[in-house]
Structures are given as C-alpha cells and as structure tokens.
C-alpha cells in the first residue's frame, strides 16, 4: 500500500494511525482477532476553518497568529497542554534576530527578523521573561546577540497572544490523519478526549517538527537521523557569578552575553566554556552523558537550559527507540547533577527544577518541498525572487558563517510541500542538506518561516486560490505590512 492509499484510508475510515492501515488491516474480517485489527468505519463530526496549523511549537505559534491577524478563521492543533515547543523545551536562547555583525569589523548592525517574533519579545520584556537582545562580549563570532527567555513566561505570553488574535487553540489534541482529495489536502483528522473530528480548511500548515501532517497526506520525505536527541533541564540552587568567576580564573569563558536578569540590567545571561577549568574526571563523565554546559538564564540562581544528548540508532519517529532514549536521558540528567555538585563551583547545591516533557529533536522527517535550500544558498548569502524572510545566523559558526555578516533569504517555494496543494510546511522539517539545516532549523528562523506560512495560508483562503496560485506580490506586501524584513544582503 502506498502513502496515497494510506492517507485516503485515514481520512475515510478514521483509522487510529499508520500501523493499522499500512500493514494491510483490511485483509481480516471485522471483529476477527488476529495479527491485525480493522477498525470499523465511522462518521466524524466536521468543523470548518480557513486555516489549520498543526503543531504549536516555535513555528506553529507564529503561523497561527499570522493567519488569524490576516482575518482567517484559524485552528491550532497541539498534542501537549501548552504552546511553545522547542523554544520552551530544548533551545538555549532565541537565535538570532540580528546579523553576525560583530564578527565582521565594519559591518552594520541590523535586526533582520522583526514582525510577530519581535512582538513576542516585546511582550516577554513587559512580563520580565527575557534578557532582551543581549549583546555578546565573548564568542561573538558565533552570534552577535543572545535573546534568552523564561520558558514558563513564554508559554503564557504566546498563549495569550493566540487568544487575542482569535485563534482556536486545541491543546491536548492529537493530529491523527489528513483528508486528501487527489493532490489537494482538504483538512486534518484530530483526536482528543472530546472525541475524533474532521477539521476542514482551505489551507493547512505543518509545523509539527516531525512532519506528521505532510506524512499523513502522502508527501515525500526522508529520515536522515543525522542529529543527536536531547532532553534539557533547568537547574536551580546555583550561583551564576561564582560559576563565571571560576571559569574566568582559568581563562575558560568562550561565550558571554549581558542583559536583563531578575529585573537588573547588565547581568550575565549567557555563559559558555571551552572546558579548560574542569577536572579530567568531570570532562570524561560529561562526555559520556553528552552534557553541554551552554548556560542561559534570565533569573538569579538559575541555569535555564543544560542539555544531555545521545545519538539514537534510528530515526526519532521510532516509538520504541524514543522510549529507550527518554529513560536514558533522564538517567543522564541525574548523573549531570552529581557532577555539578561535586566538581563545579557555584553548583554545589544545584538541583533539577525543570525538564522537558519529552525528548527534543533537531529534525526527524525532512519533507520534500518545491525548493530545497542548499548550503551555498546559506553561506553565500543568496536571496530569491520570492523571499519571505531574511536570516543571518548559523549554528556551526564560526566554522560556517553567512558570508560577510550578511543574510540569506527563505523563499516561499521552500515552504510549499512538493506534490500537494494547499499544504505548507515551516520549521525544522524543511531543508535536507545538513549544513544548510544547521541554520534554517534555528528558533528565530523557524518563527519567521511560521509568519510567512501562516500569512500565505490566510491569503490563499481569502482568495480561494491554491498555495501555488498565490501572487507573490500579495504575499510580500502582507509580510512587509506586518513588519517582516525582506531582501537584506
């Protein structure tokens, strides 16, 4: 059975998921016990929207707000009980609203991502939930600005912004399938404790990180499994200043940014190390558990993000492999606290105050789109005739940097899912090339992609046109009006 047949089966039969249909469930008579079970056909209640956004993470939140601000009746589906995604669970900070000007003397400082992402930062600032755009004083060949956040305040702020925009926010709701008619995606199947339902829309946006909606719809994809998975934790009972003094005394500070922390300006909000200060026992054990000591914080006595990582043998779409990784990562977190207590000044009384509810990925499925952004596109600072945002950060810096501290463009065609109409994608599920993806997957880039995709979806719904029929000029005008920066170089 091919993906197209599978997708139609999900839509028409209301099947619970891929396994039941993909393995030929129809071969068994209804009610027969055996290797497979065929779910009986059932009618699902229908709700109609202009735009469906799947996944309320980094890209999805912004996509839904953007669509609703354009006047589209929008629903946002999220399996957890809150919006936020990787921003609140696995990131170290928001990277990056600015070009890498500090690494290139004479290059102008420019904020290249604005629009809804900047609206979020301004709301966080009012709520005391961000460092602000904190300038880097060390390690600025990696990033010129660090924007640290409070994970819990972020969840509240974006939840409120979604409500204010008029988005129907369906948290605690699973995406269970796609409704497909030929090459056109007509809607999504959602399931919650309120029941199973069909959500019809004129345009849909997949922001699930895993590419679940696109996969259900029959899109082509690959699963490169080229990154480790992580679980991040927040660590309390620490002294940021004592830890900094320890690193500084050994010449071990590799990154340093200062901004707002606990209501005071000019405080350390980001701190990384080259590892020189740590005893060999700590280094050896930290390496075994994949411990990364990149610290960001907006509170005294708290490290907002410390990560444990591991490389899975298979893609993080594997349920059983993920279960094993979830357990192992939590064991590693406990070991990390032991190491901090024993070896690191300022961390003698450290304890786990927060963990991610599930492991964090950098990608799982890579969804084929009309255009696949390449590494030369990123590194050579290329722009396109259909740019929907500009971006200038690369997570492999200083080894890889956008040329001359400039920016490259994300084209609209890179957000259109190949072979399907009415379906867009945004976030870490686009871009197959690893080096290019090391830029496009980052949080602020995902946010910008979300604004573009949500805006495009709303315009398609208003004009009753397909995602490939939308005039670029209309999309460009709407994005610029909403504060998006385009055509920077």
Residue ranges and their predicted role:
Residues 60:
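N-terminal Rossmann-fold NAD(P) dinucleotide-binding loop
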Residues 46-57:
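Beta1/beta-strand and adjacent pyrophosphate-binding region of the FAD-binding site
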Residues 30, 66, 72-73, 79-177, ...:
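Conserved N-terminal/central alpha/beta ligand/cofactor-binding core
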Residues 41-42, 86-88, 128, 155, ...:
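Flavin (FAD/FMN)-binding glycine-rich loop and adjacent Rossmann-like elements that form
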Residues 33-48:
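A short, basic/flexible loop-to-alpha-helix module at the beginning of a structural domain
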Residues 5-26:
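N-terminal export signals
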Residues 162, 172-175, 189-198:
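A structured beta-alpha segment of the ubiquitous adenosine-cofactor-binding alpha/beta core
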């Amino acid at each position: 059975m091919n993906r197209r047949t599978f997708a139609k089966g999900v839509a028409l039969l209301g099947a619970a998921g891929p396994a039941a249909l993909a393995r030929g469930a129809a071969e068994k008579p209804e009610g027969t016990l055996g290797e497979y079970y065929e779910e009986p056909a059932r009618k699902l209640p229908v709700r109609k929207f202009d735009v469906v956004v799947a996944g309320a993470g980094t890209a999805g939140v912004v996509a839904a707000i953007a669509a609703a601000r354009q006047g589209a009746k929008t629903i946002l589906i999220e399996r957890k009980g809150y919006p936020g995604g990787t921003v609140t669970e696995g990131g170290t900070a928001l990277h990056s609203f600015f070009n890498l000007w500090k690494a290139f003397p004479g290059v102008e400082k420019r904020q290249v991502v604005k629009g809804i992402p900047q609206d979020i930062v301004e709301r966080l600032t009012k709520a005391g939930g961000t460092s602000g755009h904190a300038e880097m004083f060390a390690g600025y060949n990696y990033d010129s600005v660090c924007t640290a956040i409070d994970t819990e305040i972020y969840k509240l702020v974006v939840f409120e912004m979604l409500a204010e925009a008029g988005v129907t926010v369906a948290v605690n709701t699973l995406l269970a399938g796609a409704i497909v008619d030929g090459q056109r995606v007509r809607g999504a199947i959602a399931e919650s404790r309120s029941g199973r339902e069909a959500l019809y829309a004129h345009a849909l946006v997949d922001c699930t990180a895993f590419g679940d909606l696109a996969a259900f719809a029959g899109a082509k994809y690959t699963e490169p499994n080229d990154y480790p998975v992580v679980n991040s934790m927040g660590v309390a009972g620490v002294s940021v200043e004592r830890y900094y003094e320890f690193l500084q005394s050994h010449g071990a500070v590799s990154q340093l940014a200062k901004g707002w922390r606990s209501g005071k300006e000019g405080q350390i909000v980001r701190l990384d190390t080259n590892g020189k200060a740590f005893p060999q026992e700590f280094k050896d054990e930290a390496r075994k558990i994949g411990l990364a000591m990149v610290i960001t914080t907006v509170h005294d006595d708290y490290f907002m993000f410390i990560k444990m990582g591991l490389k899975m043998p298979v893609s993080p779409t594997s349920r059983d492999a993920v279960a094993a990784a979830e357990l192992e990562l939590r064991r590693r977190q406990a070991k990390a606290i032991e190491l901090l207590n024993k070896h690191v000044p300022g961390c003698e009384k450290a304890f786990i105050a927060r963990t991610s509810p599930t492991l964090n990925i950098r990608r799982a499925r890579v969804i084929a789109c009309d255009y696949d952004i390449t590494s030369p596109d990123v590194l050579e600072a290329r722009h396109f005739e259909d740019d929907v945002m500009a971006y200038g950060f690369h997570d492999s810096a200083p080894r890889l940097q956008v040329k001359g501290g400039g920016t490259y463009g994300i084209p609209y065609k890179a957000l259109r899912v190949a072979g399907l109409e009415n379906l867009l994608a945004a976030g870490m599920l686009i871009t197959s090339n690893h080096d290019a993806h090391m830029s496009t997957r980052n949080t602020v880039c995902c946010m910008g992609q979300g604004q573009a995709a949500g805006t495009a979806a709303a315009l398609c719904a208003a004009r009753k046109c397909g995602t490939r029929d939308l005039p670029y000029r209309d999309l460009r005008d709407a994005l610029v009006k909403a504060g998006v920066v385009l055509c920077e170089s």
